[in-house]
Amino acid sequence: MKVAVVGATGMVGQVMLRVLEERNLPITELIPVASERSVGNKVKFKDKEFTIVSMDDAIAVKPEIAIFSAGGNTSLEFAPKFAEVGTVVIDNSSAWRMDPTKKLVVPEINANVLTKEDKIIANPNCSTIQLVMVLHPLNIKYDIKRVVVSTYQSVTGTGKAAVDQLNSEIKGENPEKVYPYQIFKNALPHCDVFSDDDYTKEEIKLMKEPKKIMGDDTFNLTATAVRVPVQGGHSESVNIEFENEFDLEEVRNILSETPGVTLQDDVKNNHYPMPLYSEGKDDVFVGRIRRDLSQPKTLNLWIVADNLRKGAATNAVQIAEYLVANNLV
């Protein structure tokens, strides 16, 4: 099977190649794609070197699957061109997520919605993925009424230039800024651009995407997204109000038995999720599970995941694996 990785030199693209190496997708030909300035350069994959090609050359090869991590404008322009030659596109950008004709997929939750007719499949936002991995099983059991989420997001979510800014500031240098302010020793309540209603695009994604993935628009959700000077992964403080009463031990049991979720909830031994220890892992980690003492039927918890892996690359590869396993490609 021929697989194109579009945006192969970016942070997510590099992790994508690593995840593809680790997993069992039956790749016979890898087609790395990047910007024109990178064409002709090499990337390593399974101890071999592959030459980066242009978008047009990749389309001409007619790969079975193309995984995009190259930004929304690139996806809007080129994903349909791949689809025209029969390629299934799995897109990491926000370009197609809320398009009513496109599926927004977290495989553990809703891969069953995919069909052979789906030629452009949207990969959700990184912070959305880890959130719905926890919300979905609890919604099935207790029926969610309202969610309040505050995020603490890694600079890796912005890209390599943001990581370089943080590392330079740690050294006491004065680098070119990706963010409007210093990120070292700071926290910026400003993930992505602000919309007319004063929410950021990141917050709007968090408020809209879960409902589409979970197939449930009956609950309300509000979000505040904050960029923090860490590199390991994204963290989320989540407050969930349910329609039905819950039992804390049952909540822990449900989450511990949810595929792709690891329970870390032993505060007596200082055992709880942290972004530093999520780095390089594919699971979503959940802990600090406790009742909200201010109102009934309400739960507080803390969710952490590697935003480059389950939040992006791993989820996309899992979609590809599902397509192959179910003869949808």
Predicted regions and their residues:
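Charged docking surfaces used in two-component/phosphorelay signaling
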Residues: A66, V155-V329
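N-terminal Rossmann-like NAD(P) cofactor-binding subdomain of oxidoreductases
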Residues: M1-I183, T218-N220, V284-F285, I289-Q295, ...
